[in-house]
Amino acid sequence: GYLGGYAAPAISYAAPAVSYAAPAVAYAAPAAVAPAALTSQSSNILRSYGNLGQVSTYTKTVDTPYSSVTKSDVRVSNDAIAHVAAPALAYAAPAAYAAPAYYH
């Protein structure tokens, strides 16, 4: 019910919800220095006259004091085979020769 008085609005003021924390920083021991690795890489393409065929080589090597790995790839291609069909040659079997019929 109505009590005849003036009611104040229900307003509350609070401090903003802000929290401050120390930054999360972790310090670790310095990383161990590993010995250097030696690497080498080479590639070569040898093409025939008229670029009808080619041989492609690729080699990569990684050497460390603990291991050694070598990867190599050799590919041979001949475009002349792909574009020129082999001639169709058919040979008949030789005729069978029997000894002549010879009667006495």
UniProtKB/Swiss-Prot annotation:
Domain of life: Eukaryota
InterPro entries: Cuticle_C1
Cystine connections: none
Sequence-type repeats, residues: 7-10, 14-17, 21-24, 28-31, 85-88, 92-95, 98-101
MF terms in GO: structural constituent of cuticle
Keywords from the UniProt entry: Cuticle, Repeat
Written domain comment of the UniProt record: The tetrapeptide (A-A-P-[AV]) repeats found throughout the protein are also present in many proteins constituting the protective envelope of other species.
Task performed by this protein: Component of the cuticle of migratory locust which contains more than 100 different structural proteins.
PANTHER family: LARVAL/PUPAL CUTICLE PROTEIN H1C-LIKE PROTEIN-RELATED
The protein, known as: Cuticle protein 67, isoform B
Lineage: Eukaryota, Metazoa, Ecdysozoa, Arthropoda, Hexapoda
